[in-house]
């Protein structure tokens, strides 16, 4: 009888142990059930895209011009050939051919070699990312921990801020795939992964490109001198932008200010250029132009999506004299890199170059303050960074100088150098760049000065290192 009781007690204890171990297994089973519920979706074996129950799509036949219409039915793709016609508007990127179903509005892109995705937006040859990877459109899909990324279109991400069903998903690089992206201007590409039954954000293991191209150029030694500087070619300053504004009371447009290309779709400039508060649709940005109004062979022109002026800009002292223009484009890429068009490198937050470091400025501004017109050709000037002790009101006729400003000027003197290099009216918003780690790097934005080319009086520039956070925050989608 005692042995029987012991046996029953042992069975009860074993049963209790099994019951108490259930929560861990149940968690796993919940995850497995979720996977099975997700499994009623369809995976297109040709494109590897995932579609939900009853969702339909078009797909091209790889070896023919036929197009199939497919529908997800209980986890299986049911497909049949449908007649198509050319799309009425441009929908495919990177040279893709667009076909639209004859009887309904859906479309499909036949992508050239090296590209895939709904709109040929995925670059299968992209093996690394540049800068922070905001424009990375490759196929890397593994996080730094080795986990596989979740498809951005997954129902599991519906309540997340960034998913493939956002209205601006294609612009952010999101869609029906699980490739690493950086839609929020983070420090590098990332994705969502499953860890301990939770969805978390993890950075990806995609490598950074070994050599950044920002700040590189094919410098041409200037041959002609001009008052205030030297005539130059755009290939010597490929980050230089020209900003134009529509005339308010007449047709046409006028040159407004200079600007600086800092990424494919963003131009940095001076806030004081927009004191008249031009709406974005009245602005135009030209890149790759040597002559101010004469079109160049390799120039690129863009309308403006956004004009962001620093919220604390002081139009009296010119403190916080900084603004951002977002270029308008139908794709994630705006400016195409070339010898004439290339972004400048932004500085590290702690970058401090030695006093009297030689730097360069460029712009289409006046030759001197009394000139009636702006320069017809791009000019460059060579100036040196002034010590902070020489960048004060005392040396600038009691004008206000804040910690958000820096000074630079031409320190050459004597009869050999009668032409003092300096910025002037019309150069505003342009760059002050210096060599750092073999790349030209943006130190300042041309802001204000006392006259133009006055001996021993420096020009004043917006100190870019003070605004890296502001730039980053405002470039976020």
Swiss-Prot record:
InterPro entries: EGF-like_dom, Fibronectin_type1, Kringle, Kringle-like, Kringle_CS, Kringle_sf, Peptidase_S1_PA, Peptidase_S1_PA_chymotrypsin. GO terms for biological process: plasminogen activation; platelet-derived growth factor receptor signaling pathway; smooth muscle cell migration. It catalyses: Specific cleavage of Arg-|-Val bond in plasminogen to form plasmin. The keyword Signal applies. Residues 83-121 form the EGF-like domain. The keyword Protease applies. Keywords: Disulfide bond, EGF-like domain, Glycoprotein, Hydrolase, Kringle, Plasminogen activation, Protease, Secreted, Serine protease, Signal. Belongs to the peptidase S1 family. This is Salivary plasminogen activator alpha 2. The active site is at residues 272, 321, 428. It is an enzyme of class 3 (hydrolase). Residues 40-82 form the Fibronectin type-I domain. Transmembrane segments: none annotated. Gene3D superfamilies: Complement Module, domain 1 (2.10.70.10), Laminin (2.10.25.10), Plasminogen Kringle 4 (2.40.20.10), Trypsin-like serine proteases (2.40.10.10). Residues 1-36 form the signal peptide. It comes from Desmodus rotundus (Vampire bat). Monomer. Glycans are attached at residues 185, 398. Its EC number is 3.4.21.68. Probably essential to support the feeding habits of this exclusively haematophagous animal. Probable potent thrombolytic agent. Disulfide bonds join 42-72, 70-79, 87-98, 92-109, 111-120, 128-209, 149-191, 180-204, 214-345, 257-273, 265-334, 359-434, 391-407, 424-452.
């Amino acid at each position: 009888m005692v042995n029987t009781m012991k046996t029953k007690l042992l069975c009860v204890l074993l049963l209790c142990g099994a019951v108490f171990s259930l929560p861990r297994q149940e968690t796993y089973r919940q995850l497995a059930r979720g996977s099975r519920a997700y499994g009623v979706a369809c995976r297109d074996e040709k494109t590897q895209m995932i579609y939900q129950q009853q969702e339909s799509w078009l797909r091209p036949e790889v070896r023919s011009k036929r197009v199939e219409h497919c529908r997800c039915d209980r986890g299986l793709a049911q497909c049949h050939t449908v007649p198509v016609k050319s799309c009425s508007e441009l929908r495919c990127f990177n040279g893709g051919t667009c076909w639209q179903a004859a009887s309904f509005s859906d479309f499909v892109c036949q992508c050239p070699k090296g590209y895939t995705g709904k709109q040929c937006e995925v670059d299968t040859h992209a093996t690394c990312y540049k800068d922070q990877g905001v424009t990375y459109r490759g196929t890397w899909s593994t996080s730094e921990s080795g986990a596989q990324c979740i498809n951005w279109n997954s129902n599991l991400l519906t309540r997340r801020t960034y998913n493939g069903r956002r209205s601006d998903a294609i612009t952010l690089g999101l869609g029906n795939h699980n490739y690493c992206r950086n839609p929020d201007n983070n420090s590098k590409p990332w994705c969502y992964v499953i860890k301990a039954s939770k969805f978390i954000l993890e950075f990806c293991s995609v490598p950074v490109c070994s050599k950044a191209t920002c700040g590189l150029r094919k410098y041409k030694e200037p041959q002609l001198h001009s008052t205030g500087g030297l005539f130059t070619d755009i290939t010597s300053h490929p980050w230089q932008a020209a900003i134009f504004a529509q005339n308010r009371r007449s047709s046409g447009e006028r040159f407004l200010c200079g600007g600086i290309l800092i990424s494919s779709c963003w131009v940095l400039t001076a806030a004081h250029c927009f004191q008249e508060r031009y709406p974005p649709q009245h602005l135009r940005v030209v890149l790759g132009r040597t002559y101010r109004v004469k079109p160049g062979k390799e120039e690129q022109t863009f309308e403006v999506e956004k004009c962001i002026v620093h919220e604390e800009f002081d139009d009296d002292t010119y403190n916080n004299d900084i603004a951002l223009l977002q270029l308008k484009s139908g794709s994630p890429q705006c400016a195409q890199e070339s010898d004439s068009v290339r972004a400048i490198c932004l500085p590290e937050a702690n970058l401090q170059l030695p006093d009297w470091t030689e730097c360069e400025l460029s712009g289409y501004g006046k030759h001197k303050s009394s000139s009636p017109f702006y320069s017809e050709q791009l000019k460059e000037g060579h100036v040196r960074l002034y010590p902070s002790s020489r960048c004060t009101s005392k040396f600038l006729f009691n004008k206000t100088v804040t910690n958000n400003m820096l000074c630079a000027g031409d320190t050459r003197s004597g009869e050999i150098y009668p032409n003092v290099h300096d910025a002037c009216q019309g150069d505003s918003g342009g760059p002050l760049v210096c060599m750092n780690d073999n790349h030209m790097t943006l130190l300042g934005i041309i802001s204000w000065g006392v006259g133009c080319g006055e001996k021993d009086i420096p020009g004043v520039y917006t100190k870019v290192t003070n605004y890296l956070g502001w730039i980053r925050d405002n470039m976020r989608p």
